[in-house]
């Protein structure tokens, strides 16, 4: 029985081969042709698939820009107006200034003389009515005095008073019932201190009384906080608190 050698060359001249060999050789050539067609079609399919993927990729490229830029734009839209329309809770007042005072025992009427001095200084430049030039905000542990511009808007300049350093406050003054004043212990650069009396004029007597009550409440919260932290002895009375605060804060 005749069989095709394994090392048979793919020769164009097959006349010397038997008919069975010719048919086998023809079959091999057809198989090779089919393989080439399949490979070509596969390459075309891969090329087509790659082009489709490229199209899809190109279409999706702008999406990250939308995803990352949109929230940023929304954030700017929401935060920018808030910065422009930022408001502070507090009472609009006319800050009369401060003057140094002496003594360590602050009783009823101790702010009358300093307030009269500040009132006289301020009335020299007074026209008809004092325009509000500050916003006084009393918080649990601090008092913020926001200075206003000529438009009545809060500026970046603000004076901060620690409630623990406030020795006395009152809204009871003979010169004007609308004045609220407080005595504050100011620490100097050389660690020495001085007692300053600050005064503001409110729009009404009621507003001045409200500030006095708010200051008293802030002082109470500060006292209880320092007492719970052990910074004030449990048997300390309200009269001894100012001395405790001064020794602790100095």
From Swiss-Prot:
Which Gene3D superfamilies does the record match to this protein? Pleckstrin-homology domain (PH domain)/Phosphotyrosine-binding domain (PTB)
Single Gene Ontology BP annotation: negative regulation of protein localization to plasma membrane
Matching PROSITE patterns, A to Z?
Answer: PID
Q: What is its main location?
A: cytoplasm
Residue ranges, annotated region (Disordered): 229-250
The superkingdom of the source organism is Eukaryota
Induction (free text): Up-regulated in fat of obese subjects.
> One Pfam family name from the record?
PID_2
* Tissue specificity note: Expressed in subcutaneous fat, heart, skeletal muscle, brain, colon, thymus, spleen, kidney, liver, small intestine, placenta, lung and peripheral blood leukocyte.
Keywords in alphabetical order: Cytoplasm, Phosphoprotein
SUPFAM superfamilies tied to this protein: PH domain-like
**Amino acid composition bias (Acidic residues), ranges on this chain:** 241-250
Task: Provide one Gene Ontology cellular component.
Answer: cytoplasm
Residues making up the signal peptide according to the UniProt record: none
**Which residues in this protein are found as Phosphoserine?**
236, 247
Q: Which residues form the PID domain?
A: 93-250
- Relate the assembly described in the record: Found in a complex with PID1/PCLI1, LRP1 and CUBNI. Interacts with LRP1 and CUBN.
**Function summary:** Increases proliferation of preadipocytes without affecting adipocytic differentiation.
Protein's name in the database: PTB-containing, cubilin and LRP1-interacting protein
Q: What is the organism field in this record?
A: Homo sapiens
